Amino acid sequence: MALIPTLIEIDNIDEKAIEDSKIETQAKHVIPYKDWGTKARSLDVFEIPIEFCKYRLENGRIRTEILTYEKLKGKLISNEQSTQEIIHKFIGNSDKKKNSDLIKILKKDGQTDPAIITADGFLINGNRRKWALTELNKDVPDEKFKKLKVVILPGTGNAERPTVTDIALLENRLQVLVTGKSEYSKMNKALTYYSNVKAGIDLTELLKDDATFTDAGSKNFKKKVKEFENEYFKPLELMNDYLEINKVQGDYEKVANRWMSFEALGSDVMSKLNNEKFKVENNIKNDEIGTIKAAGLNLIKLKDSSAVAGDNRYLIRQIPKWISNEELKKDVLKIGLIEDDNDHIEDPDERDEEWQKQKSTEIISLVKKL
């Protein structure tokens, strides 16, 4: 039996409110939805009140903040005003320089390209524009800042109503790919793709639109998909392991500034530990791999490694050299066996502070011997 694609949910009340309030502009715009871009199929551009345009929780630019907030404070409901205010704040803090520049551009030149919304008002792109126009309205109340130019995706009863996959592919084409716009951080890009894949969207579908990838049917394309997984998913999986070990699952903001350290652990260490030739040549036993990985995670956890290295990544990159020496490997394994035994401390920040006091000196002493 063929799988039936999951359609996005549409709030019929909000859909009708937008239908009743939209104002024609006589302009047309082509968007990369389904195969419409290649067919140059254009949509009407409308103006609608800015309050009818809503932020999506799936916004890739602030994926780290959303996931962390939901982990620490509970599930967010897209349609609730409190959720919209939280997302507005996250966007305002995401790139203050670009936000400030956009306000100046909108104030001087107005809107150019329209945003894209679902039939009930959720923004696929244009989140930063909504934020900027909302802020402009506070300081410079003006009718031209109270409406957003949009194209509206097919709605209820339309055969081309979006599926969940359609929305993921559209957002991917508009934002995640290199288009000259404000691009996601590597971590937010990883979280966006990873969430889509976990939701059942095929990674090859997401990547085949990327101009940096080759034809989807070629062997080279399959190789590049694997490289993408290694570059984005492997560090994220190590990050998830780190957060779980430290009892702060889902709190991505705690490690947002350590992405490159997880990259180094994946590319410079774990890739070698998964290589049979490397393990045989360096006498690495399979039951040592988990402890070596734990050593890498402990080195990432160090807040101050200045006594032994310029940054944690340098230490991570030394691990393959250290474990190739039987004597030095013993000290690496000792680092991996250092655990957080402060389970009685409930507050994660206090627990981490205590770990830094108790364990970091021990780790630094072992590193100095290497």
Predicted segments — roles?
Residues 323-370:
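Charged/polar low-complexity intrinsically disordered segments, enriched in acidic residues
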Residues 90-91, 138, 144-210, 215-237, ...:
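Amphipathic, charge-rich alpha-helical segments that serve as recognition/docking helices
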Residues 100, 130, 191, 227, ...:
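Non-catalytic, well-ordered alpha-helical scaffold segments
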Residues 2-141:
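Short, charged/polar connector segments at secondary-structure boundaries
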Residues 287, 291-329:
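Eukaryote-biased activation of long, low-complexity terminal tails and linkers
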Residues 220, 230, 250, 287, ...:
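Alpha-helix boundary/N-cap detector
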